[in-house]
Design a protein with these regions (language model features):
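Acidic/polar-rich alpha-helix caps and helix-coil junctions
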Residues: 2-204
Length: 204
């Protein structure tokens, strides 16, 4: 779970609505947060200029290629992967304490990072929280051969998305679409395997 002193926790709606003073540009914000959204609903992304009525204004967005926060995570992991585990731990601790913890709280992952593997798992947890919904962590999980588990008791994933995979998921490899291979049959023999149906959804 996300530390209660980590401001990123408020990117999702807490089941205990009284734990945080949620603010919204909506005129019905009090009712909206109390009754209009499910627990853990994502509220990380907000409409531009607070305009949720006019999509031409509220839908405007910047598409950044790389956030500076990503560089901090890359440096911490690279330092540890390069043989300096204490140095990687120090870098992650400094970033989290200086930029993510609130009210003077200190983040320290030393106890969770006795090995390189345990440190990378902790770093990836923080990175997944940081970049939720931004579409970059899949590449790290693929590179690190990490497993994913979407099917379990209490999951809120839709039924067809409850896929449990040990190691790299087959659907993380891009498959050239059928329309393209029909128009250019030579590339059909160079395509990645179609992952459809390879992983059965968890049924409980």
């Amino acid at each position: 779970s996300i530390d209660t002193r980590d401001f990123r926790r408020h990117s999702w709606l807490d089941p205990d609505r009284s734990s945080y003073a949620y603010k919204s540009c909506r005129e019905d914000s009090e009712t909206y947060f109390a009754q209009g959204l499910a627990d853990y609903a994502n509220i990380k992304f907000r409409p531009a200029q607070g305009n949720y009525k006019d999509y031409k204004v509220g839908g405007a967005a910047d598409h950044c290629c790389m956030r500076v926060e990503e560089m901090y995570f890359i440096e911490a992991e690279a330092t540890a992967q390069g043989g300096d585990l204490p140095g990687g731990i120090k870098l992650l601790n400094e970033f989290m304490t200086n930029y993510r913890m609130m009210n003077g709280a200190v983040y320290d992952c030393t106890a969770k990072s006795s090995t390189l593997e345990s440190f990378v798992n902790e770093l990836m947890l923080q990175k997944r929280i940081e970049f939720w919904g931004e579409g970059i962590v899949m590449y790290d999980m693929k590179r690190l051969n990490m497993s994913s588990k979407r099917g379990y008791v209490g999951t809120n994933a839709p039924a067809s998305y409850r896929l449990n995979v040990d190691g790299r998921a087959p659907y993380w490899n891009i498959v050239i679409t059928r329309g393209e291979t029909q128009n250019n049959p030579i590339i059909a023999t160079q395509n990645n395997p179609d992952p459809s149906g390879l992983i059965e959804p968890w049924k409980g």
